[in-house]
Amino acid sequence: YTTLFRSSIIVERFGADTLRLYEMFLGPVEQSKPWDTNGIDGVHRFLKKFWGLFYDRQDNYLATDEVPNAAELKAVHKLIKKVTGDIETFSYNTSISAFMICVNELTSLKCSKKVVLEQIVACLAPFTPHICEELWEMLGHNTSVCDAQWPQYNEEYLKEESVNYTVSFNGKARYNKEFPIDADNDTIQKEVIADERSEKWMEGKQIVKVIIVPKKLINIVLK
């Protein structure tokens, strides 16, 4: 009875979607979990951030018909793949983590493109049906989001095109640099040595050797 009472208070304050999402976020469904509402604010902030992809703080509608770029497509298709697999194994908590990561990425990219938002809404609807039903209608649909086709991910959008290397001098990390995923060691070495950020660490010193750990690290040994 106490838990039901607390639940009704949460619904009144945060809404039913926040409660649903929070309960699924607590951990694997097969495990018993103590009732704890300490993290519910974070879940509510996520939903507000998600809403922020559709409307700004002045309540201006943001969704556009623009074509998404590679980074935006990668973010949403990575999400679709993760959630599709997680739902099959009832791993709802990790799905919600994936939603949070995706929304953070799209917020950073300032992405409010309908084709991207539609797919997220369709994926999120089983978790938060009320807000998703409203957003689905705002995106121009006359039917319920419950009748929407489940999005399909495309592996082509998930391919890594570049790799982020940590550049170190005598074992101490100094900066990071992106390289095409197919860049060879000679190209990587030449570009790092020519990078203006390397100058102050190499000034007055001699290169003994360059160690390249594929897709991870470049260490320039100096004396």
What is each PLM-predicted segment?
Residues K200-K223:
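Cysteine/selenocysteine-centered motifs that mediate thiol-based redox chemistry or coordinate metal-sulfur cofactors
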